[in-house]
Each structure stands twice: as C-alpha cells, then as structure tokens.
C-alpha cells in the first residue's frame, strides 16, 4: 500500500470522510510495509487494500459488511465476499450468498464471484479489517483497521441520505450503534458454519430494496452475469 496523501489514493468524498483517520491509515501502511520487509506478505494486493474507498462516497446506498479478506492467495480483491471473475472454486460464504440471492429474487445463479456490478450501483462491500496474512484468517485484527472502518461507517450514516446496512454475523452486528438512523438487516453469517442458523431464508436483497424504496431511493438490481 503506497505512502501517499488520502486525496491521491481515495475517491474525493472518501478522502474527506476519512481525513480524521489519515494518521491511522498512514500507520497501517507502515505496518504493511514492515510486514513485507520482514518477509511476510499480506492480502489483498497493495493496490486493492483501499479499493472499497475508490467508489463514490456520495453514491453509497447499501452497505454489506464482511470480517476480513479471504486468506487464500488469489481470492481477496478488496471487496468483502467478492473474488476475481477467474476464480472457479468459490468460497463457501459466497456460494451461500448466491444460494440466498437466487432463492430471494428468483434470479439465475451468477456465473462467477465478481460482485463489481453491485458496487457500480452504490453497494459498498466493506470488510471490517482490510488486510490479513496469507492462510491466516483474522491475522490483522486489532492492528488498527477497525478504527478506519468505524469512521467510514459513521460518515456514511451521518450523510442523511438513503442507506441500508446488511450485517451478517456478530462482528458486523456490533456496528449497529454507529449506523443509526439507517435501517439494518441482520442475520447469521453466510459461512457454511453458520448459514443454517438464520442466514438462509433471511431475504436480505429484497428487504434492502424495500428499505431503499421507503427512503425514496431506487432499488438495486442484484442480478449478476
């Protein structure tokens, strides 16, 4: 992750929203460069660490919170739950998200795990922690990313424009106090370990669209190629 001013690496709205975290983001960059210097790599690739903050801040209308990047090399691309289109064997969580998407909206199963079409419609796919070590889930928890993403979420809620938050799992649900007055949709995490405990059947996509309509906003076209 390059050592640059926020205005040079983030979308202008995000650069302003995250200005209170400029020192923390710089410190996280120092941490990642120290990891590389010590012979330890991290995921996702440096140019994708802050990818979620490169889409327009003012356009965000749905927030989907993940935990941290996929620890399998070649999968994490800077968006929660998404993988590159060439990844053929999808993570279990994403398979379950697609299963619920098809059941909720009666749409065909997506052909790959690229969720970029959602981001183009104002869906922010944000991990609570933005990096991890290869094959070590949660390796960078408590290092400082939580402060950054908390500020991002507070800034979104403070805009006073339509917003719906989809919170899957206990980690994501802990962010509810920072999201008021935005409506939240909460359930178990889509992980294969927990999806049967309330994720399946929760209909998050249709419910999110209903909340958007109630706020006078256009619904999201959740269909994926």
From Swiss-Prot:
> Can you supply a Gene Ontology BP term from the record?
base-excision repair, AP site formation via deaminated base removal
Protein EC: 3.2.2.27
Q: Which residues form a coiled coil?
A: none
- Any idea which residues are catalytic in this one? 68 (proton acceptor)
Compartment annotation: Cytoplasm
Give a GO cellular-component term. Answer: cytoplasm
Q: Which reaction does it catalyse?
A: Hydrolyzes single-stranded DNA or mismatched double-stranded DNA and polynucleotides, releasing free uracil
Record key words, sorted = Cytoplasm, DNA damage, DNA repair, Hydrolase
Job of this protein = Excises uracil residues from the DNA which can arise as a result of misincorporation of dUMP residues by DNA polymerase or due to deamination of cytosine.
Which family does the similarity line name?
Belongs to the uracil-DNA glycosylase (UDG) superfamily. UNG family.
Its name, as the record gives it, is Uracil-DNA glycosylase
Q: Which organism is it from?
A: Parafrankia sp. (strain EAN1pec)
Gene from which the chain derives: ung
């Amino acid at each position: 992750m390059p050592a640059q001013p926020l205005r040079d690496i983030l979308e202008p709205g995000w650069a302003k929203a995250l200005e209170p975290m400029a020192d923390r983001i710089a410190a996280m960059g120092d941490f990642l460069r120290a990891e590389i210097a010590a012979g330890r790599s991290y995921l996702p690739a440096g140019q994708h660490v802050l990818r979620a903050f490169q889409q327009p801040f003012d356009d965000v209308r749905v927030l989907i919170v993940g935990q941290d990047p996929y620890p399998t090399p070649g999968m994490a691309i800077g968006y929660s739950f998404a993988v590159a289109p060439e990844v053929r064997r999808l993570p279990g969580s994403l398979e379950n998200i697609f299963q619920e998407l098809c059941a909720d909206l009666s749409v065909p199963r997506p052909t790959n795990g690229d969720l970029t079409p959602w981001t183009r419609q104002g869906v922010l796919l944000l991990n609570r922690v933005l990096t991890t070590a290869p094959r070590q889930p949660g390796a960078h928890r408590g290092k400082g990313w939580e402060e950054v993403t908390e500020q991002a979420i507070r800034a979104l809620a403070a805009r006073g424009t339509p917003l719906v938050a989809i919170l899957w799992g206990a980690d994501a649900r802990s962010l509810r106090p920072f999201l008021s007055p935005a409506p939240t949709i909460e359930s178990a995490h889509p992980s294969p370990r927990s999806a049967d405990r309330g994720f399946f059947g929760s209909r998050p996509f249709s419910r999110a669209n209903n909340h958007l309509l109630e706020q006078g906003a256009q619904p999201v076209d959740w269909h994926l190629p």
